[in-house]
UniProtKB/Swiss-Prot annotation:
Organism: Ovis aries (Sheep)
Gene Ontology CC annotations of this record: cytoplasm; intermediate filament
Predominant location category: cytoplasm
Function: Essential for the proper assembly of type I and type II keratin protein complexes and formation of keratin intermediate filaments in the inner root sheath (irs). Plays a role in the cytoskeleton organization.
Pfam families from the UniProt entry: Filament
Highest taxon in the source lineage: Eukaryota
Tissue expr: Expressed in skin and wool follicle. Expression localized to the inner root sheath of wool follicle.
Protein name in the entry: Keratin, type I cytoskeletal 25
Region feature Tail, mapped onto this chain: 391-450
Annotated segments matching region Head: 1-78
Family, per entry: Belongs to the intermediate filament family.
Residue ranges annotated for the IF rod domain, each copy included: 79-394
Ranges where the record places region Coil 1A: 79-114
Region (Coil 1B): 137-228
Length: 450
């Protein structure tokens, strides 16, 4: 309902489709499609009902005629016809009011049905009973957990097989390296054996040379002895008175003893030199073999430590990779679940916002209809006051205006009442037609004339 003041620049109009109220001087007009006009005492009064819809129902479609009252009196001419017309107008007015109340009741019933259907206990997407889906959801969760566990076990078995293969590969590499090391050691010992064999051959050659020299010396000694024996065995008989000569046998024996002692000494020296060289060479070989064995043991130990560390590193890397895969899979699952929950929350918020918007719109429509009802009740009271106003005959709870009789109306018209109701809704509007402030003033003056 809106109010317009022709004398100022302020206006009121929250909903242009619900009706309008215009004031001109001391009069008021209500209009929204159907009009019924009643000139008042010293003023003009017009009302309109219609174009009010609720749930697809429309009220008011035919205009009602008006009745006039002059300033000199309430009735003029044929009072019976006038009262009949007045009763007809009032009956039509009350029928419109009753239809509006029925539309209001229908709207309330629809709102109640909507709350029963989409209320807090049955709103779609908000409080549905999902208990029947809980076993299915639990079964699906168990299947997902079982599948995830089986997948994790398969991944773990694959990682274990990979680690075992890596361990065997490292063992093979270590054994191969150890085999190559042993072969290199054997080759080194073979070279040492060749050197020793060469030394032995050299010593044997020296021994043979010394043996041949000894044999040659013995042969020369034998030949000299034979020559000396032949020279001493002739028939020369020389007698001389001289000193006794040297005994050649003793001399030869002495020479033989010297040569034998010299040969024995040479043999001993050669044997001692050979033994000394062999001992030093054997000691050097033993030391080299010990150093080689120690170095080989150290190398083997270092390789074993390296193998152990590499196995541990591979195991830790595989564990790290498995944990990263599990973490990535878990994050993906939780992100998917979070996105699903967020989508459900967004859908529920959208439904809740839509429900709130519809509820607020229906609330506003209900308040507007209630305001219209209140204004109509006030208009009925004002109408009753204007036509003589019996307090028991005109009430908003029971509309019995069709039972008015012409005689009663004639009695009521004997005491006319003049009532002026002025309602002002003031709105301050800027240059862009934007409402700044709204104020409502209601002034009512009653006077009774004899």
């Amino acid at each position: 309902m809106s109010l317009r003041l022709p004398s100022g620049s302020r206006r009121a109009g929250p909903r242009p489709t619900t009706g309008s109220l215009r004031l001109s001087g001391a009069g008021a007009s209500f209009g929204a499609g159907n009009a019924c006009s009643m000139p008042g005492i010293g003023s003009s009064f017009s009302c309109a009902f219609g174009s009010s819809s609720s749930g697809g129902n429309a009220l008011g479609g035919n205009p009602c005629a008006g009745f006039t009252m002059n300033e000199g009196g309430l009735l003029s001419g044929n009072e019976k016809v006038t009262m009949q017309n007045l009763n007809d107008r009032l009956a039509s007015y009350l029928e419109n009011v009753r239809a509006l109340e029925e539309a209001n009741a229908d709207l309330e019933q629809k709102i109640k049905g909507w709350y029963e259907k989409f209320g807090p206990g049955s709103c779609r997407g908000l409080d549905h009973d999902y208990s029947r889906y809980l076993p299915i959801i639990e079964d699906l969760k168990n299947q997902i957990i079982a599948s995830t566990t089986s997948n994790a076990n398969a991944v773990l078995q694959i990682d274990n097989a990979r680690l075992t293969a890596d361990v065997f590969r490292l063992k093979y590499e270590n054994e191969l390296a150890l085999h190559q090391s042993v072969e290199s050691d054997v080759n080194g010992l073979r070279r040492v054996l060749d050197v020793i064999t060469l030394c032995r051959t050299d010593l044997e050659i020296q021994y043979e040379t010394l043996s041949e020299e000894l044999t040659y010396l013995k042969k020369n000694h034998k030949e000299e002895m034979q020559v000396l024996q032949c020279a001493a065995g002739g028939n020369v008989n020389v007698e001389m008175n001289a000193a006794p000569g040297v005994d050649l046998t003793v001399l030869l024996n002495n020479m033989r003893a010297e040569y034998e002692a010299l040969a024995e000494q040479n043999r001993r020296d050669a044997e001692a030199w050979f033994n000394e060289k062999s001992a030093s060479l054997q000691q050097q070989i033993t030391e080299d073999v010990g150093a080689t064995t120690s170095a080989r043991n150290e190398l083997t130990e270092m390789k074993r430590n390296l193998q152990t560390l590499e196995i541990e590193l591979q195991s830790l890397l595989a564990t790290k990779h498995s944990l990263e895969c599990s973490l990535t899979e878990t994050e993906g699952n939780y992100c998917a679940q979070l996105a699903q929950v967020q989508a459900q929350i967004g859908a529920l918020e959208e439904q809740l916002h839509q429900v709130r918007t519809e509820t607020e719109g229906q609330k506003l429509e209900y308040e507007q209809l209630l305001d219209i009802k209140v204004h109509l009740e006030k208009e009925i009271e004002t109408y009753c006051l204007l036509i003589g106003g019996d307090d028991g005959a005109c009430k908003s709870g029971g509309y019995k205006s069709k039972d008015y009789a012409a005689g009663n109306m004639g009695n009521q018209m004997k005491d006319p009442i003049r009532a002026i109701v002025v309602k002002k809704v003031l709105e301050e509007v800027d240059q862009r037609s934007k409402v700044l402030t709204t104020r409502l003033h209601s002034l009512e003056e009653k006077s009774q004339s004899n």
